[in-house]
């Protein structure tokens, strides 16, 4: 039976959605209709939200799951009148944390995502700009400033991984696509050799690579299974020969790939 889930917040909804998605992912056999509802920050909005929740309960014949990070007690009480199963994330964790720290929390809306006074903000922006400027081998003369350089065949997940690490952790990650010419030379490009300690390889199953490339250039040599299989085989051989740590990205999310890379390379996050 399909269930409905709401991620409700008086801020952006990022925290409610992130934690809620992580919890729901543990129930793979249950399909969910998921709805994010940010900025529920007034009684009128809360009452309208209750109507949405109750409508979903009537439609589904079972109460929706509600993940909320509402700070205002009055708004939480209005939401609690709905026909939903509420998981109040802040009250679940803040109260015991207040007891342990012997201190009261600020109960500030959107506190963790505030830009003002956040010393990490500029580092995040600089890291994202670095990832964009050094994407796809476009520039190589700034590799000495990189924390990491991801290498692999075209369309194996290098760019989104670099951008995720930049956004989440302030990591300056460049990426370089290994081409057929590199494979024929049976060695790393010279520009990568002098940065060997920063290299990390991404590989991918050929059939998955074929599907991804087909969306970009259908019915081309570039997206053919034979070409994809050849490139993956040669790049994996190069990784082994050059002793480059690597991971197969096929069955992992960007979050998982990033975490595994940082652990493997021992790179410290600039902020957490």
UniProtKB/Swiss-Prot annotation:
Q: Which reaction does it catalyse?
A: [pyruvate, water dikinase] + ADP = [pyruvate, water dikinase]-phosphate + AMP + H(+); [pyruvate, water dikinase]-phosphate + phosphate + H(+) = [pyruvate, water dikinase] + diphosphate
Reply yes or no: does the keyword Cytoplasm apply: no
Q: Which residues bind ADP?
A: 152-159
**Tell me, what is one Gene Ontology molecular-function annotation carried by this entry?**
ADP binding
Indicate yes or no for the key word Plastid.
no
Q: Which cysteines are joined by disulfide bonds?
A: none
Provide the E.C. number(s) assigned to this enzyme. 2.7.11.33, 2.7.4.28
Q: What class of enzyme is it?
A: transferase
What UniProt keywords apply to this chain's record, in alphabetical order?
Answer: Kinase, Nucleotide-binding, Serine/threonine-protein kinase, Transferase
Q: What does this protein do?
A: Bifunctional serine/threonine kinase and phosphorylase involved in the regulation of the phosphoenolpyruvate synthase (PEPS) by catalyzing its phosphorylation/dephosphorylation.
What does the sequence similarity comment in the record state about its family?
A: Belongs to the pyruvate, phosphate/water dikinase regulatory protein family. PSRP subfamily.
Name of the protein in its database record:
Putative phosphoenolpyruvate synthase regulatory protein
């Amino acid at each position: 039976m399909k269930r409905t889930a709401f991620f409700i917040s008086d801020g952006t909804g990022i925290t409610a959605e992130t934690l809620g998605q992580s919890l729901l992912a543990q129930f793979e056999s249950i399909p969910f209709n998921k709805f994010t509802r940010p900025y529920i920050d007034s009684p009128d909005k809360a009452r309208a939200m209750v109507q949405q929740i109750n409508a979903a309960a009537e439609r589904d014949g079972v109460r929706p799951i509600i993940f909320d990070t509402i700070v205002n007690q009055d708004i939480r009480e209005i939401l609690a009148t709905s026909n939903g199963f509420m998981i109040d994330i802040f009250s679940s964790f803040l109260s015991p944390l207040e007891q342990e720290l012997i201190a009261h929390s600020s109960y500030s809306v959107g506190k963790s995502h505030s830009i003002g006074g956040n010393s990490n903000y500029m580092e995040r922006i600089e890291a994202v700009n670095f990832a964009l400027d050094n994407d796809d081998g476009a520039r190589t003369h700034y590799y000495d400033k990189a924390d990491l350089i991801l290498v692999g065949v075209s369309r194996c997940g290098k760019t989104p991984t670099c951008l995720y690490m930049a956004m989440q952790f302030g990591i300056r990650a460049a990426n370089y696509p290994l081409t057929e010419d590199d494979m024929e030379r049976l060695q790393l490009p010279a520009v990568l050799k002098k940065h060997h300690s920063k290299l990390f390889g991404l590989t991918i199953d050929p059939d998955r690579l074929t599907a991804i490339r087909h969306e970009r250039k259908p019915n081309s040599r570039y997206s053919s299974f034979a070409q994809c299989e050849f490139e993956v085989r040669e790049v994996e051989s190069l990784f082994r020969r050059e002793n480059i740590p690597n991971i197969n990205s096929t069955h992992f999310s960007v979050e998982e790939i990033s975490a595994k890379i940082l652990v493997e390379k021992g790179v410290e996050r600039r902020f957490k």
